[in-house]
Amino acid sequence: MIIESEGAQITGVRGDPMHPANFGKLCSKGATLHLSAKDEVTQQTRLLKPQFRQARTDAFSETTWDLALQQATSKIAQVVTQHGPDSVGFYVSGQLLTEDYYVFNKLVKGLIGTNNIDTNSRLCMSSAVAGYKMTLGADAPPACYEDISLADCLFIAGSNAAYAHPILFRRIEDAKAQNPDLKIIVADPRKTDTASCADLHLPLKPGTDVMLFHGMLRVMLMNGWVNNAYIEKHTEGFQALQEKVMTCTPAKVHEICGIPETQLLQAAEWFAISKATLSLYCQGLNQSSSGTAKNASLVHLHLATGHIGKPGAGPFSLTGQPNAMGGREVGGLANLLSAHRDLANPVHRKEVANLWGLEEVPSKPGKTAVEMFQAAAEGEIKVLWIACTNPAQSMPDQRMVRKALERAELVVVQEAFATAETCAFADLLLPATTWGEKEGTVTNSERRITRVRAAVPPSGLAQHDWQIGLNLANHLSKYDIFKPLAQRMNFSYSNPEAIWNEHRESTRGRDLDITGLSYAQLELQPEQWPMSEGASTGVKRLYENGIFPTSSGKAKFVGLEYVPVSEPCESRFPFSFNTGRMRDQWHGMTRTGTIAKLFGHVPEPSVQLHPQDMQSLNLSNGDLVHVTSKRGSIVAPAQVSDELAPQQAFMAMHWGSGFISGRDHQNRALGGVNAITTSAFCPSSKQPELKHAAVKILKADLSWKLLAMAWLPANQALQILQALRSRMTHFEFAS
């Protein structure tokens, strides 16, 4: 993206025609992003100065950066002294730049001495990470965007790319236009816009992907469609998996998944016998209590057929945020260390300790996202530091999340937007820079690293996230409990490039080796990793030689069982509730929600239901319904949709407490879609099951309705709306 500006004001954006990821194309969100930077908007939304309050019932008062960090570090030092370093938790974001991520990872795991740092990428990508590592040996997507145009079969699972990855979806449309024989298979409970373009749509029941993939592999085995030579030469463990999948007959797949046997056979045939099959998959696989098994079972299909390590083929996980990949590279998850090292590996811990000038880094596993907030809700974690993410909207089971935010003794929110829901729970607000103001790097789904450059100076007193991390480290170093380690560690980086250089050196000899890549080279063009010292360019696709980063050099088949969803539907809660993206909104809408034209596609929240369910509940479009789970209840308009099967319900994930009111079962106010989602997570990846919750749906007969409209000055409208939202929570439905 190219940002246009006049002085300190962003005035426009356009796609970069030379960038190999998008070739100048922008989605609706990207093309309108500059509108969220208009002065009349930012005056109402941006956090511009540090703010502090003594009690959460008090109003915030402006303070200086020095005093703000003194307040924070004094409390952190006190808590660590009394309760140990694991009483502190940091929750960061896939929208940080790689350099920001690196500093906070080093700060928390090195200086503070806890592995309690996790990222909202846990909500979107950790199952993909675990699946790749379980089967291929490393968290490294083996394919690239170019492979879309080279494939003979595209298998799209758990991804509505038309909405979630619209520029990539344009590539799919172009590939089909250039090669009408290209077969497109979409496995998704909903008939999305992506599924509507498919040659074959597999409308499986939520959570049954492992059974589907096992059933496809059984069909391949029975018909001789597996690549025995590839299996023999480049893999291990196939016999154990083969025994598992032989029980997954077409009849059983039909029973569990709801897929007709003919569709199963067709999908298996196209996948296996095509010259090159590329899988594209996203949150439908990842956001599951079986997320790791889903990912690994799909990778198994590629290994069994040899559709990996060649043009147009491979299992290609699509990332959910701009720099989810960069966070994985620096070890920004609670179970990882820098450069794809494993926290559980003592050799890896020693390598990172040497890099950071320490005797050791802590070995105790850190709390992952859901675990961290559960620990805070139980009083185990006393301090929560939240950067560039909005857990008071985006985390599942908001009852638990809000209890955590209320019980923590100190909540620091490092944020660019004062309108984010989590700000209301903070003791200390720290203003951070946002897009257009930041310098550093990001990595996309195809391992391509891109330089990010600032177009305008920081707004107000906002600081870069990496600077906040360094200043925090320097303030902590004044306390005796941190001083010995601080004297051994380097937190004196003068710019993002200095951080990048240390991160780059940490990758030497690793699967993502970027020792051959510098800021100077990134000024010329983005590059894919690995790009080791001496290389002139990065690597397009991985494993072309059939050698994998495992102890044996072979990829692994794992005998995984199909396990149903964590919360099965039953008579009291008969509907399967699913969440996902809208085309024109982004995450919690702190930016896109300020742009009026982006509400043109979907103007208000609704729960989508099958026509049969609408009829049985005596509902018409727009009628209000209670959607209730074991955690709480919300009220929303019902909308008929033929995209869903009976007894399924869908709502967009973006609608927070500013749009949807709700209550928990003790009648305490909750809000947003995640008032009813479950915090159950995959035991391997710890990623929560946001794609299914058991709910009941009942018509809401409210006593009165009011529709009010007003024309408001543009420089006041958002502020007035924000004030109104604090009152909307008192009504059963207000939007």
Where are these regions (language model features)?
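Extended redox/cofactor-interaction regions of prokaryotic respiratory oxidoreductases
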Residues: 102-173, 180-187, 210-214, 302-425, ...
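Flexible glycine/proline-enriched surface loops and loop-helix/loop-strand junctions
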Residues: 154, 197-198, 247-251, 280-285, ...
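Long, contiguous, secondary-structure-rich segments that constitute the structural scaffold
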Residues: 459, 465-525, 592-608, 612-735
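Conserved short loop/turn motifs at secondary-structure junctions
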Residues: 89-97, 256-259, 282-289, 321, ...
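Flexible, glycine/charged-enriched surface loops at secondary-structure junctions
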Residues: 83-87, 226-231, 278, 309-316, ...
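Short beta-alpha connecting loops at secondary-structure transitions
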Residues: 196-204, 431-433, 437, 447-459, ...
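N-terminal leader/propeptide and maturation segments of large enzyme subunits in energy/redox metabolism
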Residues: 55-62, 223-261, 338-351, 356-360, ...
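N-terminal export/assembly segments and adjacent metallocofactor-ligating motifs
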Residues: 1-225, 233-234, 241, 247, ...
